[in-house]
Amino acid sequence: METSSKGLLTQVTQFWNLLDDLAQSDPEGYEKFIQQQLKEGKQLCAAPEPQLCLQTRILKPKEKILFINLCQWTRIPAPQSTTHPVPLTVGKPEDTTEISDAYTVIDVAYNPDVLHAAEKDQVKKNQLIQMAMKCIEEKFQFTLSHSYHITKFRIKGSIQRMKQNLMGIQTDSIDLREKMRRELTLGQIRSSTMSNPDHFPQLLLPKDQVSGKAVCLIEEISSTEIQVEMKMPAYELKIVHDHSEKPLKIELKVELPGINSVSLCDLSVSEDDLLIEVSEKYRLHLNLPKLIDTEMTTAKFIKEKSTLIITMPLV
């Protein structure tokens, strides 16, 4: 133990000597180095932020509504390249019961650059969502419905709850960044170490800042695992008007080559969007131009033409 401590002290002393030399020989380089360390430390302490929320269903082991909060978090590294696995972390499921219904919330975090790249690319966004759902299924042994829709709110539940879930620490006490401001400066660490070689300053978090929960491990989902990329089928959407040019309904015709049964089609419709998934071959998600009456919506499958026709009366 004594030998190990002396070896560590030697390394620390060498490190400070290198910093002293750098400060004298290259003040600009020294300043850049210090700023880089502060930047990386700030990123490490940064909290996850909500990006979007999607709603789907848990089918097994017990059917229930599921909300997935997709968050951005600088602590999650970006993939090294487009061919490398995409890192993400998944929080534990949290069940909530309200007056009218019960549902589960799961928080998932990606690197901010990964989510920003998918903001205007529906294909990339769908891949990230499918990766998150696949990871949830494998991690918790769930079977999820592959139909989902993005909600109008960015997060289900409070931001504080999401941070506690993903970070594994309490965030309602003094901000962690305030703790960092109280940390010993580099000069103090150096002088303290040199004056008393047996003492190494430590930054200790108070008891209310430490949680018994382990921080979630980052899991990597390789992009090669999501090779079953469903194609967007050809479709025609039109608004049907009456004689006075008043809009009555929306008609959507979707061509599904190779599909000969309506049982292979999974259709989900809300007031303002529509999702069609067909036997892991086709996927079509549309934001509708007008609000529709979901209860009066009908669908007809023409087997001879492999065509699905959906009629959606307007509200």
Curated annotation (Swiss-Prot):
Signal peptide boundaries: none
Pfam families on file: PIH1 (PF08190), PIH1_CS (PF18201)
Assigned protein family: Belongs to the PIH1 family.
Protein name (Swiss-Prot/TrEMBL): PIH1 domain-containing protein 2
Classification via CDD domains: ACD_sHsps_p23-like
GO terms (BP aspect): box C/D snoRNP assembly; protein stabilization; rRNA processing
GO molecular function, one term: small GTPase binding
Gene: PIH1D2
Cellular component terms per the entry's GO annotation: cytoplasm; protein folding chaperone complex; R2TP complex; ribonucleoprotein complex
